Each structure stands twice: as structure tokens, then as C-alpha cells.
Amino acid sequence: MSKDVFILGGKRTPMGEYVGVLKDVSAIDLGAVAARGALEVTSVQADEIDHCVIGNALQTSGDAIYGARHVALKAGVPFDRPALTVNRLCGSGIQSIVSGSQMIQLGEVRTCLVGGMESMSQAPHVIRGARSGFALGQGKLEDSLMVALLDTYCNTPMAGTAENLARKFEVSREEQDKYALRSQQEAKRAKDAGVFAEEIVPVEVKSRKGSVQVSEDDHPRPETTLEGLAKLKPAFAHDGFVTAGNASGIVDGAAALVIAGEDFVKQKDLKPMGRIVSWAYAGVEPEIMGIGPVPATRLALEKAGLSLNDIDLVEVNEAFAAQYLAVEKELGLDRNRTNVNGGAIALGHPLGATGTRLVLTLLHELHRRGGRYGLATACIGGGQGIAMIVERV
């Protein structure tokens, strides 16, 4: 890159179980909590933010069209600073970092508040065509979340794309379940070691009984066993592989980072977490969208002048165990350096927020281990992949 962009730090909310403790907190309010946490942990003042870019895949609340703008305002960013909501589906959280970095490189801004947010619990049920009225017997209630998870271009649900990868790359059900168990086990180890506590900013949830501070992910199932996973029936096809146990969890959550150019970092005498080295996106066949991280990673490595051997840690979003394993096989990933604290199978996958969470988790772990380079990558519904390489500073 022609101009260095640095990640100063960030925070994420806990990942809340579908229709669980965070179900009444909108994506925007989750985003605002993460944004305020990011500002606090970096000691950057809200009035020092020049632009806000937030990723969001499903617009589920009534005020969702205001997206990043409302996140910025609720985080205390002044009225005269603009905001942008971006949607590259599951890559939105990384795309927000890319878009903010591009603004910094172009000299438009010095700082940017970036991140992602998602409330999957608030995805509404809708009746299409109601404005024009219905004939007798018409008017079908539609689950917008389930409908969104079907790629109508190729008439394949997201889980179906994972089934396709399992067959194409000869990934057995047993392999998928073993990997799902590994995700749960590593997430438990990380949680017990206080790893996630460094990332999380609590969310206050109010009710008639008072308020409670939610400070832990509640989707992980540490009691998971291989025997239990093997008993689960395929969720989408009788002869399929994908089950509730080897797919990512539907959850609510948000994550945010503060990024800045070198001039701002030097002027404020700040100590960044990392430097953004490169990024890339790539298209693949929609029917096997989960393989998207492979070409995206190769492009990001090429742009950085690096090889996979130079990468100390990798975070690959675990949309499905079959999808992760296909990517692992194609890239030749070393599992000892990949998803070392578990992933979306255990923690959950809040679509627009996941990418930012991956980068935040990656940077924290690079600092713990003293590694230099890290790669975060995700597949994207519709047939894309996105990847970002960062360097510990």
C-alpha cells in the first residue's frame, strides 16, 4: 500500500444466542456499544473521528436504514462527521476496514471508526404485496432470515453450498464433526484463559426486572462430544452432512475498530495494535461460495509479497465445518496456527460483524504469541471471498 494504515484497537460485544439475551437490542445499539468501547480502549476522542464505516448484512430494525450514521451519533461522533453503511454480506466487517483504509490512503480522512453489526434475532416476518392488497386466500407470511439464506441465483441455500463443498473435496461427516468439536474445545479453552474478556465490552440489557450486564458469549457448547454430534440429523437433506452442530451459530453481535493514518498516530504518540498490510476480494461460483477465501487469500498474499509460510496466525470464518475444511485443504493450512481460539461454530456468526471480530481476535492473539503477520478471511454468500493481512506493531 502507498500509505500505511494502522489499527489502533477495538472491542466487540458478546455474541448473543438467537432469540436470546440480546434479542431486544437492535444492531445499531449493539454497534454503538462496540464503537464506544473501541474509542475508550484506544483513548481516541469521539471528536477525533473523521468518518464512520459500519458493515451490516440484514437490515432488521425499523431504523436500520440509518445504520452507520446512528452508530456514530450514539458513540458521540460529532454531527458534521459523515458515515457509511456497507454490505458485502459475511465480508462486511472486513469491508468496513477496507473502505475506511481507502479513505485514509486517499487523504480524505485521518481517522475512521469501522466495524460491523448484526441482529439476526430481529429479522422480521414479512407479507409481501400487502400494499396493493390481496385477493381471497392470498397473503403469505415469510421468514426474512430463512429467505435471505437462500441464494436465488443458483437456487441453493447457504447450507447447500457447504454440502456441495463436502462432496467436491471429499470431506466426510466424521471429519466435519471432529472439526466442530475442535472449535468448541478451543473456544472453551480460550474463554477459561480469559482470552475473550480482552475483546469484549459488556452490553447492558434492560427489562422490567431491572438491567443486567451481558459480558460473555453464550452460544458455545463446551459440553459437546463427538458422540453427541454424530447423533444429530442432517438439517437440510436426508443424505446431507450439515447439522446444527457443525454449522456456525445464528447470533447477535457487533465489533468495532479505530483505524488511522501514520500522521495521526505520530501526532498523538499512539501505540497501534497492528498495521494493515493488504486486502483482496475474489469471486467464485455461487454454488460453492464457501471456497471464496482461497482465491482471496492468494491475492492478498500476492499483493503483500508474502507466502502462507510467512503468516503466523490465520482466522478463517467457520460458516460451516465442511466449508472450513475445504479451504484448509486447498490452502494447505496448518491447524496449529489457524482458528486457535475456536470460531463461528462455537461463538456464532453475526453476519456483518464477523469480519471485524476476526481481525480483532487475530491481532490480540498475535500480541499474545509475539507473531508478526496474521490473515483474516471469510467466505461470502453469492460466491465471494475476502481476506486481509495485518502485521503486529
What do these predicted regions represent?
Residues 56-112, 152-158, 223-249, 330-357, ...:
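Conserved catalytic cysteine-centered active-site region
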Residues 160-164, 199, 207, 277-346:
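Active-site pocket-lining segment
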Residues 2, 105, 111-164:
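Flexible glycine-/small-residue-enriched beta->alpha junction loops
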Residues 87-118, 160, 166-195, 256-263, ...:
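Active-site-proximal alpha-helical scaffold in enzymes
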Residues 1-57, 61-75, 82, 161-173, ...:
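Conserved active-site "lid/cap" helical segment
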Residues 11-13, 25-33, 41, 175-267, ...:
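N-terminal extracellular/periplasmic Venus flytrap/periplasmic-binding protein-like
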Residues 1-28, 37, 141, 225-291, ...:
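Condensing-enzyme catalytic core mediating Claisen C-C bond formation in acyl metabolism
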Residues 47-55, 82-87, 112-117, 175-182, ...:
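Beta-strand segments within the central parallel beta-sheet cores of soluble alpha/beta enzyme folds
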